[in-house]
Amino acid sequence: MAFTFAAFCYMLALLLTAALIFFAIWHIIAFDELKTDYKNPIDQCNTLNPLVLPEYLIHAFFCVMFLCAAEWLTLGLNMPLLAYHIWRYMSRPVMSGPGLYDPTTIMNADILAYCQKEGWCKLAFYLLAFFYYLYGMIYVLVSS
């Protein structure tokens, strides 16, 4: 059992994916609060927008790590979400700060539904990725 760079990448990805799961849960709860009108859209967007860039940067960091470790299958599984993150950030509304959510448009029913679906899809992806990284870490540690 040898400790390789690939094993380190899987361990770090496992820990950071746990943080991304919490980000996705926060995202889902925040948009549910907006849907049920428990919270002001301006306050909600002010709490959601600072989480966008760290989430995207953590995921991009995963992709760079797995590229350096030559874990091609793992990189291939992460590339569609990375491409989506890049597209989503490039097509964001024009605002003064970094973020995706504009308080003036977030209460539109179609945008709110889209953001909720996005949160649920990301939660599913991060949960599956968590268990895949756990399997990959065990496999790399045992097979070396």
Swiss-Prot record:
Kindly give the SMART domains that the UniProt entry links to this protein: Cornichon
Any one biological process term the GO annotation gives: immune response
One of the record's GO cellular component terms: endoplasmic reticulum-Golgi intermediate compartment membrane
Which branch of life, at top level? Answer: Eukaryota
Q: In which tissues is it expressed?
A: Highly expressed in heart, liver, skeletal muscle, pancreas, adrenal medulla and cortex, thyroid, testis, spleen, appendix, peripheral blood lymphocytes and bone marrow. Lower expression found in brain, placenta, lung, kidney, ovary, small intestine, stomach, lymph node, thymus and fetal liver. Expression is up-regulated in dorsolateral prefrontal cortex of patients with schizophrenia (postmortem brain study).
List residues traversing the bilayer. 11-31, 57-77, 123-143
| Compartments in which it is found | Endoplasmic reticulum membrane; Golgi apparatus membrane
What does the UniProt keyword field contain? Answer: Endoplasmic reticulum, ER-Golgi transport, Golgi apparatus, Membrane, Transmembrane, Transmembrane helix, Transport
> PROSITE patterns in the record, alphabetically?
CORNICHON (PS01340)
Membrane topology reported for the UniProt record: Multi-pass membrane protein
Gene Ontology MF terms: signaling receptor binding
> Which residues face the membrane's Lumenal side?
32-56, 144
Subunit structure comment from the entry:
Interacts with AREG immature precursor and with immature TGFA, i.e. with a prosegment and lacking full N-glycosylation, but not with the fully N-glycosylated form. In the Golgi apparatus, may form a complex with GORASP55 and transmembrane TGFA.
> What is the purpose of this protein?
Involved in the selective transport and maturation of TGF-alpha family proteins.
The UniProt similarity line reads:
Belongs to the cornichon family.
What name appears for this protein in its UniProt entry? Protein cornichon homolog 1
User: Which species is the source of this protein?
Assistant: Homo sapiens
Organism taxonomic ancestry: Eukaryota, Metazoa, Chordata, Craniata, Vertebrata
Gene name as annotated: CNIH1
